[in-house]
Amino acid sequence: MKFLIVFVALFAVALAAPAAEEPTIVRSESDVGPESFKYDWETSDGQAAQAVGQLNDIGTENEAISVSGSYRFIADDGQTYQVNYIADKNGFQPQGAHLPVAPVA
């Protein structure tokens, strides 16, 4: 009987907890062309992302896309993190205050 009372009490507390508010989009822009793109968005909770991409060496065997941008998010610990990056023929190259930096060879 005690188990049932404790279970019902915990269930009631769980139902009474306030629901987390879903973030809404406060800004969203994009422009997509045949050889380039860009986008920029932000949500009400402070998350954001922006990027610009461009097709390089069009019409050659070295044709490749390069993208530069950044994104910002709030982690489970409540801290905001930002990552700036370049993604091109050399791979994804992120930078951020919270990311380790490779030693210079």
Swiss-Prot record:
Keywords attached to this entry: Cuticle, Signal
Keyword Signal among UniProt keywords: yes
Keyword hit for Cell wall biogenesis/degradation: no
Annotated signal peptide: 1-18
GO process terms (BP): chitin-based cuticle development; larval chitin-based cuticle development
Cellular component, GO, one term: extracellular region
Residue intervals of the Chitin-binding type R&R domain: 34-103
GO molecular function, one term: structural constituent of chitin-based larval cuticle
One Pfam family matching this protein: Chitin_bind_4
Function comment: Component of the cuticle of the larva.
The protein's name: Larval cuticle protein 65Ag1
